[in-house]
Amino acid sequence: MSHNSFGHLFRVTTWGESHGLALGCVVDGCPPGITFTEAEIQSFLDKRKPGQSKYTTQRREPDQVRVLSGVLLGEDGVTMTTTGTPISMMIENTDQRSKDYGEIARQYRPGHADYAYDVKYGIRDYRGGGRSSARETAARVAAGAIARKVVPGLEVRGALVSIGAHDIDRSRWNWAEVDNNPFFTPDAGSVEVFADYLDGIRKNGSSVGAIIEIVAEGVPAGIGAPIYGKLDQDIASYLMSINAVKGVEIGNGFEAARLTGEENADEMRMGNDGKPIFLSNHAGGVLGGIATGAPVVARFAVKPTSSILTPRRSIDKDGNEVDVMTRGRHDPCVGIRAVPIGEAMVACAIADHYLRHRGQTGRV
């Protein structure tokens, strides 16, 4: 199986399966001299880890990260400094229950990658989906924690903006609310609505999708490239690689098709500091594939997980018709834990383009 790596200069390779002994990543191309602690990486992993509320899978994984290479440990025994060599990180699996998947070892779960993996490779890991499981994304979150350190002044934040047909009220957007509720939503008024809705979904053994918005501030103007090396192109590609993601927008996205040229174009003026400013940000911080210095804004849609208790019609490896009901522990809305994953992937894309821009122009 190939295609386990992404990035050009800031290159990340992930490894491991949902029910294996461990999973992890290797970050290659990280500049030397960047300092961080395992606790900083852990803070992002804790946001993604399962079992934190009744609205996520009850699989209990501490997701404790270990940095194995590519750093020098400081005299304080805590601070690590990158050496410029590959940074390897590992997260052990401690709460896998493969017996839950015995019934579907030969059955194809509707909506999952079971059949696609089997038809391509002639073999699949039925225990939680193997590499196709969202468990793999823990390694991406660890890599994203490093990526945030590569670009000085970069801040990447994410929030859940809709669950099913329920949208937040954007007039109540407050970033301070995101970490104060189990849905990572910036609208405190939507928390009770989301909770009541997901309670019903969860009790019925069903699932629902979500939309997540990522905002990156402090992105240097000029990074990115025209045509085939666009910053927004790579952000979209990185986000589409996340399990269950079915759509990505940059800036106004599909809504731009409903606007006139006067409504959509971002007008400019000179700011008080003598630097250009945009009077709006319909473009989402990218024009011609190159960052403008405005916040980079992306949204991605996550489908409902196909692991539900409702019996669904399918076939097995022998072509027999079967009804499949997925047991085990699953998220009623995988979009909740996709928030830190989306943040990580956007951070990795920006870090890669930052290094590419520096290498090509000598400027940042």
From Swiss-Prot:
GO MF, one term, reads: FMN binding
Pull one GO CC term from this UniProt entry: cytosol
Q: Per the UniProt entry, what is one GO biological process? A: aromatic amino acid family biosynthetic process
Q: Could you say which residues bind NADP(+) here? A: R48
Q: Which NCBIfam families match?
A: aroC (TIGR00033), PRK05382.1 (NF003793)
- Residues annotated to bind FMN: R131, S132, S133, N243, A244, G288, K303, P304, T305, S306, S307, R329
Recite the UniProt cofactor note for this protein: Reduced FMN (FMNH(2)).
Where are the membrane-spanning stretches? none
Record-linked InterPro entries: Chorismate_synth, Chorismate_synth_AroC_sf, Chorismate_synthase_CS
Signal peptide annotation: none
Q: What is this protein called?
A: Chorismate synthase
Coiled coil start-end? none
Catalytic activity field? 5-O-(1-carboxyvinyl)-3-phosphoshikimate = chorismate + phosphate
Tell me which cofactor or cofactors this protein depends on: FMNH2
Q: What organism is the protein native to?
A: Brucella canis (strain ATCC 23365 / NCTC 10854 / RM-666)
Instruction: Extract the CDD domains matched here.
Output: Chorismate_synthase
Q: Is the Transferase keyword given for this protein?
A: no
